[in-house]
Structure formats: C-alpha cells, structure tokens
Amino acid sequence: MLRFQRTVPRVAIRRLANVYSEGAVLHGYKVRRAQEIPEMRMAAVELEHEMTGARHLHLEREDQNNVFSVGFRTPPPDATGVPHILEHTTLCGSQKYPVRDPFFKMLNRSLANFMNAMTAHDHTFYPFATTNQKDFANLRDLYLDATLRPLLRHADFLQEGWRLEHRDVGDASSELVFKGVVYNEMKGQVSNADYYFWIRFQEAIYPALHNSGGDPEHITDLSYEDLVAFHQNHYHPSNAKTFTYGNFPLRDTLRKLDDEFRGFGRRAIPQMHEKPLQLREAVSVEEPCQIDPMLPADKQCRTSMTWICGNPNDVYETFLLKILGSLLFDGHSSAFYKKLVEETGLAYELSVNTGVESQTAANFLTVGVQGCTDVGQVHKVIMETFTALLAQPFEKHRVEAILHQLELSKKDQKSDFGLQLLYGILPGWVNNTDPFDLLSLNSALQRFRADWDREGDGLFQRLLNKYVIGKPSFTFTMVGSSDFNQVKDQNEQSKLKAKVSSLTESDKEVIYKRGLHLQELQNSEQDLSKLPTLTTADIPHSSGHYFVSRDGPITTRQTDTNGITYIRMKRPLKGAIPYDAYPYIPLYSDGLMNIGTLLEDASAIEEQIRLHTGGISVSIGVHPNVETRLSELYLEISACALNSKTQYVFDIINKIMNETALSVRSEKMKVLIRAAASSFTSYAAENGHDLARLHTGAHFSQTQAIMEQTAGIEQVRHMNNLMSIIEKEAEFNTVLQNLEAMHRKIFVADGLEVMITTDNRQTSDVVKDQALKFIAGVQQSAGAESWLPEKYSRRALEKPYPALLQFPFQVHYTAQSTQGVSYTHPDGAHLQVLASLLTFKHLHREVREKGGAYGGGATYNATDGIFNFFSYRDPQPVRSLNIFRNAGKYVLNEARWTADDLNEAKLSIFQRVDAPISPSSEGLLQFRHNISDEQRDRRRQQLLKSTLDDVRRVADIYLVQPSPSQHMSAVVGPELPREVWSSQWPVIKV
C-alpha cells in the first residue's frame, strides 16, 4: 500500500537555503540568514527590506494552510485605547479600497479559515490564514493597504471608538450618551473578573505599559487627532514585522511587499524605553473589584506576589524559568497548588496571573490565588514554600514529564500550526528577541538536558536565589466591593455630565446632525466592485473524504501523524444517566480525571499521563441524531501518545475508570467544586451570548435542554446548590454516592467502540490488539434501565417573554432562538445560507454599527436544527431583540439581496466547512457524530445549489409564520431600566 507523507524533504530545504543564501537580494529584500528546523520539518528565512529596514520572517513548510501577518510595535501612550481603536479604524477603508468596512466585507468574499486583527500590550498585528493562493494574494493586498494607507475617516473613529450621541438618534430631545464599538467592547471586557485582575496587575507592575485595549473611563478622552498622529508615528514599514508560513512561493510576497514599502523610505524607530517597576524594596498595591456572585462573602479576595526575573531576550534563561514555572504551578503535584489550595484550603484556585510571563522587557514569576480570606496568611505560605523548595529536590520524573510534553508539542500537527508559531514568535520579535532562538526548541532542550544532568536541582535553586529568595516582591490584591459597579456607573455618569454641560447649543446641534449623518452613512449602499472576491467556482464541489476501516468495535485510519497515535473511545449511554442527574455530569467528568483512584492520588495519575501520553480526557457528550434530532448521550474518551507508548494509554484509562474514588476522596471533590465556582462568572463574561443561546435553544431541542443543565444557567444554579451543601457531610456524601452509582452504569463494554488514528499499518495492528484486550477487560453490562430520549422534555413554551439572566456585568448579551429542521432535511442548507445573509447584510449594520454592540449575527445549528440570533457586549439589548424579532419580515419586505450577495453567503459558510483539520481529526465526524461522507456530500450540494427564492421561502416558514411563543429570547447581564423592558420578563438571578 502506497503511503504519502506530508513532509518537507531535506532536498527541498537545501534548495531553499541555496536560493535564499545569506546576502542574496530578492525584490528589494536582503537575506540575513536561512536555517533548517528539522524537528518541525520546516526551514526559516529572515530578510530585511533594504530601503525601509522592514523585517520579514518566512517559515517554509509543506502545509497548505498558509499564513500572512503584518504587525507593528505600538506601545500605548495612555489608557485611551488608541492602539485598539486604530486597529479597528484601519480596517474601515483604505486608498485602494475606499468602501466602508472592507475587512468585514471581505469576511464573506474569501475562503480564509482565519481573518483577524489583534492588539497586544505593546504591538498590533493583522493575521489571516487560507489554503487558496488567489485568496492569499487578495487578503495580503487588502491588509497592506489597510495598515499603510487607511482613510481614517472621522466618522469611522466615532463609530468604532467613541462618540456622544442621542440615545434615539432621530430624537434631539432624547438624552446624550456615550456610544462606540470599542467603548462597549471594553466595558464588557472589564466585567470579566479574571481580565480585570490581570490588566490592573499589569498596569500596576508595569506602569510604562498602559492598557492597550483601553479603559472605558479613559477611552472618552481620546481625540481623533491623537488617533491619526499615532498611526503616522507607528504604522511605517521601518517599524513593521511581516510574516509568512506555508508552501506558497515567498517571491510573490516579497515582490508585493517591496511594491508597497518602497515609497516610504527609511525612518528611525524610537528605541524601547518601557520598563517595569524597579523593585528596590517590596511594593504592595490594593484595589477594589466587583463581587463574584458565585463565591461566599468571605472569599471575595484575589492576591498575588511577583518577582522580576531578567529579560526575555535571554531566551535560554527564559526557557528555564518556564520549566521552573511549570514545576511550581502546573497541576495537582505542583508545590503551590498543594500548599495554597489543596492542603490548606486557603484559596479556591490559583490566580489568573500565576506563572511565568514574558512582558516586553521583563520576565515575571507570579504566584497568586483567588477565593481567599486571609491575605496575610497566603503571603506567608508563599514565602515558606519558596524557602522549603531550596531544601527539597524536584522529582526527576516531573522534569521528564515536562520535557516529554515539549517533545510531543513539536510532533503534534495542529491545523493552525502556522498561526500558533506566529503567536509564539511575535511578542519577543517586536522587542528584539531573535526569532530563530525562539524557534530553536531542540537546541534549548539539548542544552537543558546537559545542564540538568550536570547540576540537577541546582539549576532551579540558582534561579530562585537569583530572583526570588530575599529579593523585593510586588504584591497585588483585589478585594470585592459591594458598590463597585455602582461606583463605575457613577463615574461614567459624572464624566458624561461634565462633557454635556460644557456643550454650547451649537455643539449640541452639531452632535445631533453628526448622529444623523453617521446613520445615513451606515444605511448607505456601498460600491463593493473594487474589493477582490472569490466566487462559488472557487469552492470545490466535493469535500475531502477520510477513509476509515471498521472491524467490529474498532475503527482505524492511517494518515501522517508524525509518530503519534490518537485514540478515541465512545459508548452510547442509553439508560445510564437519569435525566434528573444531568446537572452532575460536569462534576462527574471533572472528578474522574482530577481526584485520583483508590490506590493513587491525583498527583500520581497526572504525572503518569504527562510522562507517557499527550493527554487523556473523559467527558459525557450529547449529540442529536442527524435524522430524528433526538438526543444521544455518549461516554467519550480521548487520548494520544507516541507510537511506542500506546499501551500506557489503555493502562491509565483502565486505572481511572475501574479504580475510581468518586465517593471516597470527598475533600478533593470539594476543591474541584470551589475551583469551578470561582471561575464561572469570568466564563460568563466572555461567553454570555452562549449562555443566552443555550437558555433559548432549550425550548426547542433536547440536546440544548441537556446542555443547559450541564453548561448553561441551570448549571450555575446547580453549582450554587452544591456550594451550599459542601460542608453538610450527609448531603454531600449522598451526592458522591450517587456519582459512584452512576459511574458503575456508565463504564461497561456494551456498545464501547474505539477509533485509532496512526501513521503505519504495524502500529495500527498493535494498538488494535491493545484496544480489543482493553474492551475484553471491561465489565460487560450494568443492567441499566431503558432510557428514552423523549423522556427529557423540552421547556414549556407558555411564556414567550424574554428572560433576564442576571449577572453583575456592565453590558449585555442577547439571544433569540426558533425551531429549524434536522441535518438531513433540505431546508437546513437554505436556513444556513439565510443566517449568513442576515449576519453580513443586515445584522452587522443594525446591531454593531448602529447599535454599538461588539458583535452580533445569526447562526444555524445544522446538527441540532436551531436558528439563533445573538448579540455580544451589547449596550442596547432590547433594541437588538426587536431587530431579531422582525428579521423575517425584513427578508420578505425590505431585503434587496443579489446573486453576488448569495455568492458571498456561500463563501462564508464554506470557510468553515472546508477549513483544514489536523490529522488527528480526520474521520472523527463520522465516528463521533455518525455523519457519513454521503450525508456531508448531499448537504454540500444543497448549500451550493441554494437560491434566493429558497432563502425567502425558509425565512417565511421558519421566521415569519411561527407565533411569538415559538421565538424564545434571553438577555444576560445587569438589571435593565424599567422603561426599556417589561415587568413580565422572568428574572433568573445567579
């Protein structure tokens, strides 16, 4: 059997080194150096543009998912968010593409599987990834013109940044309020308690690096003139770092870059001056934060201690620090997790800033906690633990486990490998760290192994003595304040009042007319003919088929896995879990992997997993049947290991599943519950629209109703209930005993299947034998009662009012759901096209541009048959719900969609359908979701053949004709003013 491996032949790498030899000049670029990186099957070339000094890094690899990025060093001068707002406004039109918002227009004129722009703490970059060479050229052209020659119109600054505008734009008597996309985005961002702690910590320890995203209290100080000046000072080729990855010709990109850059000339770039605090003595900072409703009143503190540990430009020492950080902080066996969380119960979880982080000109080593009471005792235990570490050797197997994970990370081929390399390189590269050093993992590992063999623990003890023991620290603490959000609101209103009071009547007239003008611009039709586009002719008519072989309970696939074997298991649960036990599913899954077994604690199990495998996970998945939409629950286990270590996977899974201690290790279970509770509010602040969608979708779908119990607002309420009984021994033990009983019915051989993905027949045969022996050793049947999916009823539909899911945020999230059809029904494809058209041709304008929400749109869940609307970080949630409610009528009565619009909608869908997948995921859709290649092909043709008449027909059937009670809505966020919402809305408080 002929097997084709996607590798970079050494001959090709040598050819690359010959073409791009040091000193060679190509299209205005001089080659600085070229280097083979065999462990990644890749070659790297660094070049410098002779005229401007712009640097380019190319990573040549036989990967069809090519990446391009242009980035600039953009240290913020203040907290107004000027780098962030500039990132938005550069993408609102350029000299070559003078249409409004070409970036969002290109989202559905392309087959790119990734397009974005990102503002980091001291740099801004614009990456995309695509497998289509024509698409690559189109997007590269758009990104370069957008960043170097943006129009930066005042109207775009007002829309994307901030503005004063009447609440009702058409009513000059309505109150003036702050509006703006970034303004509302950051109000939502600071509602995330983890982010707020992290950003305030960063600002305190590194005051020279301001909040690049922008503090809502300061965003309204930014002027349009400041924005334009910041672009002129920073967006210049001499300050640029460009990046390419993949197998497209480098020459084409160099030629294009030279054409774009040569008119700029060379400019002196200001040297980096941003330095962190100079800790000549200990520094302590304390600030208030919002109350976390998931935590007890006496656990509303977060605190951390930080030491500054050299410069990231010393790549090897930074590498050592990160290994040390993993030993100190990662996992159950780490010293600080044990001392601060597990053994003493001083806190619920380690803090978000715990670890080793490289930030511009400094490495920080930080250890902190959240959910604590006695801050002084936490700091005392931290210092005692560091001192004890000097006398206690690190276990050799823990170090070997870390090295094993690093080795696996080089071999594990992710579909976004190029993007991940970019994310790892760019922060150091913009701050003068050698990118080749950042790529040379092998040399760092070899040097470390030699040093570790020679010095052992002395290697880490030297670092602790150099930077931590007896050295000044920076302590940062936040304490929950009951009036925190009220104070924030008052500050906003005071600032608004001050700005409004300074306005003359003439100013107010200008603001009113400006608001009308902006609305007129937002409503205007754009001439998109200047924008490049692909067509449906560029979409392959058949999708990739991944051949799998099935023999009894074993499914196998051979592909290029680079020496790794991936193992998946599934078992239909049928009657194993009664529906009233569904809220316990997350605790069950978490407990299996994190409390240990009867004979070994969690630390021992975790170290075995890290030392011998690439990871093992156990979960309960719920998937709708693609024909009937009835829910099907599965036990799902995923793992991977080097081809030579697959037996460890089965041995460890057998140990976890057959020797579980769910009802024995009660104290460890309490630790897990507290940690989950301490992180849920931050999760909700990032995913409020998902919580809303689960709540509304639960009215129409068994799958969504179950997920509402396991991951939605019902899980929040369940978690609160667990927290209330956690110290009531009898009640809590009953919970654990029920989990144990549930487990005995879940893990049986009846229906158990295994999928093996590896790169050669010999390994496949070996692992197949291991899997069959594993199945034979599992209990055959649990005698579970029959469970019928239809027994899990959907929510009653008698209350068509939106529900308010109340959280202490500064902005809202919304969702509206309605019933669709099954995956195999032909209308499903038309509904998916409708969702894309509504998003890009209606909702983006109405919800984001006019309404000021950070995001909004429509989605169609193809497997579950639910049509969803959503908005994200939305200052006007009720307005958005009204837009959603009338969307069907808009399609029938107002939309003037064209064949080009339909073409673009299909392109946006196939970006996701045809996005590259990793070798480990090939064939997984068929194994896990029971969707065959034939069903995928049939749906593909339905999507390609969908017409505008089809779209209008399904809009009428599924959006217009259903009664109001068949459209369910929800809002996540703070209480709404009574004048904008109905008292009939049910309110669900966390």
From Swiss-Prot:
Protein role: Degrades mitochondrial transit peptides after their cleavage in the intermembrane space or in the matrix, and presequence peptides; clearance of these peptides is required to keep the presequence processing machinery running. Preferentially cleaves the N-terminal side of paired basic amino acid residues. Also degrades other unstructured peptides. May function as an ATP-dependent peptidase as opposed to a metalloendopeptidase.
Keyword Zinc in annotation: yes
Transit peptide: 1-56
Protein name stated in the entry: Presequence protease, mitochondrial
Residues the entry annotates as binding Zn(2+): H84, H88, E185
EC number(s) on file: 3.4.24.-
Subunit structure: Monomer and homodimer; homodimerization is induced by binding of the substrate.
Lineage, highest ranks first: Eukaryota, Fungi, Dikarya, Ascomycota, Saccharomycotina
A GO BP entry: protein processing
Native source organism of the sequence: Eremothecium gossypii (strain ATCC 10895 / CBS 109.51 / FGSC 9923 / NRRL Y-1056) (Yeast)
Keyword annotations of the record: Hydrolase, Metal-binding, Metalloprotease, Mitochondrion, Protease, Transit peptide, Zinc
Principal location class: mitochondrion
